[in-house]
UniProtKB/Swiss-Prot annotation:
GO CC terms, sorted: mitochondrial inner membrane; mitochondrion
UniProt keyword NADP, yes or no: yes
Protein name: NADPH:adrenodoxin oxidoreductase, mitochondrial
Top EC class, one word: oxidoreductase
Lineage: Eukaryota, Metazoa, Chordata, Craniata, Vertebrata
Positions with a binding annotation for NADP(+): Q187, G188, N189, V190, R231, R232, E243, G408
Function: Also acts as a ferredoxin--NADP(+) reductase essential for coenzyme Q biosynthesis: together with FDX2, transfers the electrons required for the hydroxylation reaction performed by COQ6.
MF term (GO), any: NADPH binding
Organism: Rattus norvegicus (Rat)
The encoding gene: Fdxr
Pfam families the record matches: Pyr_redox_2
Length: 494
């Protein structure tokens, strides 16, 4: 939900929302106990991904009169569940059913097509609502910050995922898959998702919700080998065993692992946590054990391959002789220093060049500041907070990735969002939030109308949803995603 432009607001223009010097000396508007008998708590959630919906769900469940408005910059809800989860993982998207139940509550409303920080400011939301929860996620990617990063053929994994998942702003990406080799920098689940989509036989994706445009490009792909590169070793990979197992079993492919990367690892995994131990053991078996007859036969017929390169840190993107495209990546060879969580990769002084025609950066997502009135830590990429309470901003909260950083799976975000909701409800009960009625969406609707902004509702989304499902039926897909904002608005009569 990053703003396109900044506007600085004077605190005097927003009575009752000046930051507290400390929680022990509240301003008059915050000290009166909240009367649950007289007032309906009006709560605003910014962002309709998992963090936003789980926060709303918990608030509605644990306060019988609270009303929650969920603001979203896209025309459609569900955030990374729709635009981030891989098309061949439909089971992960089942949480949409739960989110839909929340959105259909008569105490919840979806306000799509509203960019907080541009169409409406956070101080305006704080003036209209008793509490505001920022749950807008991490929509940017971590830059590599190495020479040549701007060359054509260097793509962020986040943009690539958005492209094949139908995120409107990524539809002009047009990745060139005419090369033989792709390199992915980073060894998390997103890196494995991207590798799997690049190497999966296209016919296996035909019945998923991948866009037809992406499927057409993948059908023409010449990519045969994908290298997945990490700075550290097998014990430090960020992907999970489910994603690794999918790669190992991927039809028509074979894994390439260097047994020397795993020397002495068996003894070092005895005391690591069980999930990490099982993951490392699977890597060890794949790298060092001779495959059985059936598996050997399968690998012999494989036309594509993927490999994990450990102890390599990106140093420079190498251009083609004419300087017009990526031709490879120069990697610094690393070794590990430290133990446990403090283990870090340090360069040995050696380098190696890895040729490729496509370079995908998957070194992490990053949140953006949403509004000049909201504190933001650019180094950590989060909103400074204590248990979800934004520092020096009573009545302002955060949940999800913008609260803790872009780590964990959907269930991690669920737990985190529930905790923020609990803190908010605790503050509400303790009288730490503004007393008296607040106008909620009524006030914001008037502002948006004056500014020519037309929000879309959840019933509008359900019309788009029905259209997507109908378009998918012709080709046996669960849906064909709408990717053009203008077309979506036309379908809604906006």
């Amino acid at each position: 939900m990053a703003p396109r432009c900044w506007r600085w607001w004077s605190w005097s223009a927003w009575p009752g929302v000046r930051p507290l010097p400390s929680r022990s000396t509240p301003t008059p508007g915050f000290c009166k106990k909240f009367s649950t008998q007289e007032t309906t708590p009006q709560i605003c959630v910014v962002g309709s991904g998992p963090a936003g919906f789980y926060t709303a769900q918990h608030l509605l469940k644990h306060h019988t009169r609270a009303h929650v408005d969920i603001y979203e910059k896209q025309l459609v809800p569900f955030g990374l569940v729709r635009f981030g989860v891989a098309p061949d993982h439909p089971e992960v998207k089942n949480v949409i059913n739960t989110f839909t139940q929340t959105a259909r509550s008569d105490r919840c409303a979806f306000r799509g097509n509203v960019v907080v920080g541009r169409d409406v400011s956070v101080p305006e939301l704080r003036e209209a609502y008793h509490a505001v929860v920022l749950s807008y996620g991490a929509e940017d990617h971590q830059p590599l910050e190495i020479p040549g990063e701007e060359l054509p053929g260097v793509v962020s994994a986040r943009a690539f995922v958005g492209w094949y998942n139908g995120l409107p702003e990524n539809q002009k990406l047009a990745p060139d898959l005419s090369c033989d080799t792709a390199v992915i920098l980073g060894q998390g689940n997103v890196a494995l998702d991207v590798a799997r989509i690049l190497l999966t036989p296209p016919e296996h994706l035909e019945k998923t919700d991948i866009t037809e445009v992406a499927l057409g490009v993948l059908r023409q792909s010449r990519v045969k080998t994908v290298w997945i590169v990490g700075r550290r070793g097998p014990l430090q990979v960020a992907f999970t065993i489910k994603e690794l197992r999918e790669m190992i079993q991927l039809p028509g492919t074979q894994p390439i692992l260097d047994p020397s990367d795993f020397l002495g690892l068996q003894d070092r995994i005895k005391d690591v946590p069980r999930p990490r131990k099982r993951l490392t053991e699977l890597l060890l078996r794949t790298a060092t054990e001779k495959p059985g007859v059936e598996e050997a036969a399968r690998r012999a017929l494989a036309s594509r391959a993927w490999g994990l390169r450990f102890f390599r840190s990106p140093q420079q993107v190498l251009p083609t002789p004419d300087g017009r495209r990526v031709a490879g990546i120069r990697l610094a060879v690393t070794r590990l220093e430290g133990v446990g969580e403090s283990t870090r990769a340090v360069p040995t002084g050696d380098v190696e060049d890895l040729p490729c025609g496509l370079l995908l950066s998957s070194v992490g997502y990053k949140s953006r500041p949403i509004d000049p009135s909201v504190p933001f830590d650019p180094k950590l990429g989060i909103i400074p907070n204590t248990e979800g309470r934004v520092v020096n901003a009573p009545g302002l909260y955060c949940s999800g990735w913008v609260k803790r950083g872009p780590t964990g799976v959907i269930t991690t975000t669920m737990t985190d969002s529930f905790l923020t909701s609990q803190v908010l409800l605790k503050d509400l009960k303790a009288g730490l939030l503004p007393s008296g009625p607040r106008p909620g969406y009524t006030a914001i609707q008037a502002l948006l109308s004056d500014r020519g902004v037309r929000p879309v509702s959840f019933s509008d989304w359900e019309k788009l949803d029905a259209e997507e499902v109908a378009r998918g039926q012709g080709t046996g897909k669960p849906r064909e995603k709408l990717v053009d904002r203008r077309e979506m608005l036309q379908l809604l009569g906006h």
